[in-house]
Amino acid sequence: MTTALALEYIPRRMEELGYGKNYYIRFRHLTLQAGELLELEAYNQFYILVEDPPASISVISDFGMYDLSFGKTNEQSYEHQGLIYINNYDSIPNHLRFIQVIPKHLKTEEKK
């Protein structure tokens, strides 16, 4: 998914989930060392994968999987939430980019 498409998708998705414009976005550029496994806790937020990563990187979360090296999946997920595992299977460092979407936690009165 391109960054432009993600930035177009995010407002619609957040509206769909009932947050309207009550969220923050953060651009995240992760560098994974050779063989590194990174674990992210994203239970109350979303990570939108942008700029397709190398085939040697896999992203597995409660929402789905993005892993071009795994031939048995018929769908690659770009939206991730919950516990996210990011694995660099390569023998060299690799880069991965996400847009992190963090809903604002507002009082009930403020949501109206």
What are these regions (language model features)?
Residues 20, 71, 86-87:
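Generic cytosolic/nucleocytoplasmic N-terminal low-complexity/intrinsically disordered segments
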Residues 21-58:
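Beta-rich globular "head" domains
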Residues 26, 30-38, 62-78:
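Short, solvent-exposed S/T- and G/P-enriched segments that are highly enriched in secreted/extracellular
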Residues 43-48, 78-99:
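Noncatalytic modules at the cell exterior or secretory-pathway interfaces
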